């Protein structure tokens, strides 16, 4: 495994120039490729995108900051469903960022750990693996054993990553430039509110560099789900955690690659667990985990799922939480005027939208297709593609997204839908979506085995 012992580039200008320069060169290269294809060089544009995608991914992989995190999010979206599919080569290349981020040199990781905790590694851990078990956008994870014998996972932040992200976020054009590149490559006509998008996404990413904040998030979720029959959340080891080091109890289980080789019945169970965790956390409390990607799960052969990353968590205001659930129920129950009222109260029509109750219901019912269609539902690539087109594919000038203003509190719900559907599809999961939602909302008695287990636990 290649290691990285270079410091993260710091400063607005130093971190903006590579992206801006690359984007400009890519635009020129795309024009040249298009001309070559017109003069008989078949596939010139496709080859250009494939080459450029590799270079773009390498650039993001070394950024250790906001851009790499944004790249990870996009890696989970079915880019072939966006616009003319031009972003698809980039999506495939970005997928490597989920598990192939260049790790730190072991000596550097050890230095960060000892400096942050103020003690030698041997005093904190009885055993510590120098080789990381995972490397992500702003840190990497090592296995270790505490003096009392408990197995733990130790997350160590890359040196300079926190300041680099702060510099990124201070430069409001950086994320906007990235998303403009995505829009351009995908061939859509969309013109989203980049300012609003970067504001809310930036706020969550800023929280991810604060390991003490993540520790508090983990504690909130572990207390919510302590003793749960199929949802597993680690406990924070406070005495082995600090500003740049976060230690938590180790959750065993299959990784994503191994999980996909499991029996289909087990994969169906895992998908339902993920769905119940994702939708249940803001129904049972006001917590919303906004980072649902495969590397964050540990799949148990007993049907349980462990959730290990809580850096990106949205705490919903109670009014917003209740209105959002009411909006979902109005959609499920076919109450289009109630739906329109809840959307208005949440701020979807703040810009003076003329979207009618009928149009709003048609749009939201399309987004809730899996709950409204004949049950059970088997998730496929078409399912994930439908979600993308319903939420962000703006080729039509009359698309509802062009006529509403998504409130800040709702931005990450879009991310949840875009990222969960591909996960379910890759598991090939078959689920009774409607009964699960009705059960979570208290609109009906649980019918699935997991629903009955949860009901008994509550």
Regions found by a protein language model. Give the residues of each.
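Hydrophobic residue at the +6 position relative to the catalytic HRD Asp in the kinase catalytic loop
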Residues: 295-299
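Broad phosphate/nucleotide-binding scaffolds in NTP-utilizing and phosphate-metabolizing enzymes
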Residues: 1-279, 286, 300-304, 310-318, ...
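Short helix-adjacent coil turns
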Residues: 334-335
């Amino acid at each position: 495994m290649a290691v990285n012992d270079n410091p993260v580039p710091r400063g607005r200008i130093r971190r903006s120039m590579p992206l801006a320069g690359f984007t400009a060169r890519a635009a020129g290269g795309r024009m040249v490729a298009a001309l070559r294809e017109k003069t008989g060089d078949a596939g010139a544009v496709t080859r250009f995108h494939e080459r450029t995608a590799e270079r773009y991914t390498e650039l993001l992989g070394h950024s250790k900051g906001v851009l790499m995190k944004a790249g990870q999010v996009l890696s989970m979206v079915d880019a072939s469903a966006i616009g003319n599919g031009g972003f698809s080569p980039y999506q495939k290349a970005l997928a490597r960022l989920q598990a192939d981020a260049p790790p730190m040199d072991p000596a550097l990781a050890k230095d960060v750990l000892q400096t942050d905790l103020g003690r030698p590694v041997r005093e904190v851990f009885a055993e510590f693996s120098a080789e990381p078990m995972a490397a992500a956008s702003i840190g990497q994870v090592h296995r270790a054993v505490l003096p009392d014998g408990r197995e733990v996972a130790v997350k160590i932040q890359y040196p300079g990553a926190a300041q680099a992200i702060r510099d990124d976020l201070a430069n409001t054009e950086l994320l906007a430039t990235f998303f403009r590149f995505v829009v351009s490559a995908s061939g859509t006509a969309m013109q989203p509110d980049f300012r609003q998008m970067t504001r809310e996404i930036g706020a969550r990413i800023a929280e991810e560099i604060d390991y003490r904040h993540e520790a508090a998030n983990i504690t909130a979720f572990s207390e919510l789900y302590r003793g749960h029959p199929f949802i597993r959340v680690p406990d924070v080891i406070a005495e082995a955690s600090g500003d740049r080091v976060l230690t938590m109890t180790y959750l065993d289980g299959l990784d994503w690659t191994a999980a996909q080789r499991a029996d289909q019945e087990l994969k169906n169970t895992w998908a339902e667990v993920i769905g119940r965790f994702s939708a249940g956390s803001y129904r049972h409390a006001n917590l919303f985990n906004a980072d649902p990607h495969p590397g964050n799960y540990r799949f148990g052969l007993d049907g349980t799922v462990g959730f290990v990353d809580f850096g990106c968590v949205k705490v919903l205001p109670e009014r917003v939480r209740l209105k959002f659930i009411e909006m979902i129920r109005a959609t499920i129950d076919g109450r289009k005027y109630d739906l329109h009222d809840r959307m208005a109260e949440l701020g979807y029509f703040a810009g003076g939208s003329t979207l009618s109750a009928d149009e709003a219901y048609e749009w939201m019912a399309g987004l809730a297709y899996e709950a409204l269609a004949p049950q059970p539902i088997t998730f496929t690539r078409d399912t994930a593609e439908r979600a993308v087109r319903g939420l962000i594919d703006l080729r039509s000038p009359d698309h509802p997204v062009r006529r509403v203003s998504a409130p800040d509190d709702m931005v990450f719900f879009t991310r949840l839908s875009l990222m969960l559907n591909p996960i379910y599809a890759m598991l090939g999961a078959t689920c009774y979506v409607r009964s699960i939602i009705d059960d979570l909302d208290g609109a009906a008695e649980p019918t699935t085995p997991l629903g009955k287990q949860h009901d008994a636990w509550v």
